[in-house]
UniProtKB/Swiss-Prot annotation:
Protein name (database record): Aminomethyltransferase
Annotated GO biological process: glycine decarboxylation via glycine cleavage system
Job description of the protein: The glycine cleavage system catalyzes the degradation of glycine.
Keyword Transferase: yes
Gene responsible for this protein: gcvT
Length: 364
């Protein structure tokens, strides 16, 4: 029996095409994935992300615990509401999950983890918390709606009350604030501005309807995937997993090496990997017709004239750019051209940093 979010009936009302997503009944689209994609790039769209897992970490040792648990350093967070992105690593340096952590106070943090990894994540967190004076509390009574796009904030402002609008006025990216019953954060998974709003289950349908009435278009998993890939954002399970270290997943910037004495999980293994060198995650763009897909092979010749091979982790047709884009894990020696094997032929591709579209515009 698939799990249903509290917004399931709202998806049916909007003719959502429901599919199984890691055990959850979620909308793939509401008629046109392309229209939903363009709505977020050009206007405003919203996503039900209530399948994500909200976990509160509270106690005297909350900071110390998260500094051990995460490769990024929550001690950098000094202003209440400030958030950071990073990986939760195993002892081999593999990525158990990528997540966002909000600093609420020195003894209170909120983390949001992926739905596909929920059970594994919670088991790992509860194992690691032993010995720390910390309470780890999952919050299944909370739903989450992401409102994204250039007009998302203005349209959402017509839904929020005066006190909520005052609380979020001028809020920088990667912040969250509790405003009335809503936790409103300037985060997202699209490369556009907007909010992720955590809302009590019993208020979620009314909030969704209010956003609909404000002219915010409902968007499904299909558009969510093309948007995040255009933005160069990783999808756990495709672009990285426990077999992949963060340095090979374009997450090196999220590893806080200083202070050197902070012994986060996986640090020793990761230091060894860093010293020896590892593969890297790159972006690919293809002018030719066709679509690059997950699992295809990438070939290039290195500066020594030796052929090297990598693998496509995520690929799609980019509705914004009008051609195929992809992310690929490849040996570090790659230059700025390569070939992808498609239908037994090799097709030339350009190699770029893995970021294609930000704020509605080409990012390279």
């Amino acid at each position: 029996m698939a799990n249903k979010t509290v917004l399931f009936n709202k998806h049916l009302e909007s003719n959502g095409k429901m599919v199984d997503f890691h055990g959850w009944d979620m909308p793939l689209n509401y008629g046109s994935q392309i229209e939903e994609h363009h709505a977020v790039r050009q206007d405003a769209g919203m996503f039900d992300v209530s399948h994500m897992t909200v976990v509160d970490v509270i106690g005297d040792d909350a900071c110390a615990f998260l500094r051990k648990l995460l490769a990024n350093d929550v001690a950098k967070l000094k202003v209440p509401g400030k958030a950071l992105y990073g990986g939760m690593l195993d002892h081999n340096g593999g990525v158990i999950d990528d997540l966002i952590t909000y600093y609420l106070s020195d003894t209170e943090y909120r983390i949001v983890v992926n739905s596909a990894t929920r059970e594994k994540d919670l088991a790992w967190i509860n194992e690691q918390v032993k010995g720390f004076s910390v309470e780890v509390t999952e919050r299944p009574e909370l739903a989450m709606i992401a409102v994204q796009g250039p007009n998302a904030k203005a349209k959402a402002a017509t839904v929020f009350n005066d006190a909520q609008n005052a609380a979020i006025e001028g809020m920088k990216p990667f912040f969250g604030v509790q405003a009335g019953s809503l936790f409103i954060a300037t985060t997202g998974y699209t490369g556009e501005t907007g909010y992720e709003v955590i809302v009590p289950n019993d208020e979620a349908e009314a909030l969704w309807q209010a956003f609909l009435d404000a002219g915010i278009k409902p968007c499904g998993l299909g558009a969510r995937d093309t948007l995040r890939l255009e933005a160069g954002m990783n999808l756990y399970g495709l672009d990285m997993d426990e077999s992949v270290n963060p340095l090979a997943a374009n997450m090196g910037w999220t590893v806080a090496w200083e202070p050197a004495e902070r012994d986060f999980n996986g640090r020793q293994a990761l230091e060894k990997i860093k010293a020896e060198g590892t593969d890297k995650l790159v972006g690919l763009i293809m002018d030719a017709k066709g679509v690059i897909r997950h699992g295809m092979s990438v070939f290039f010749t290195d500066s020594d004239g030796v052929e090297q091979q990598g693998t496509i982790t995520s690929g799609t047709f980019s509705p914004t750019l009008g051609y195929s884009i992809a992310m690929a894990r490849v040996p570090r020696s790659i230059g700025d051209v390569a070939e992808v094997e498609m239908r037994k032929k090799r097709v030339p591709v350009k190699v770029i940093a893995p970021s294609f579209v930000r704020n509605g515009k080409q990012a390279f």
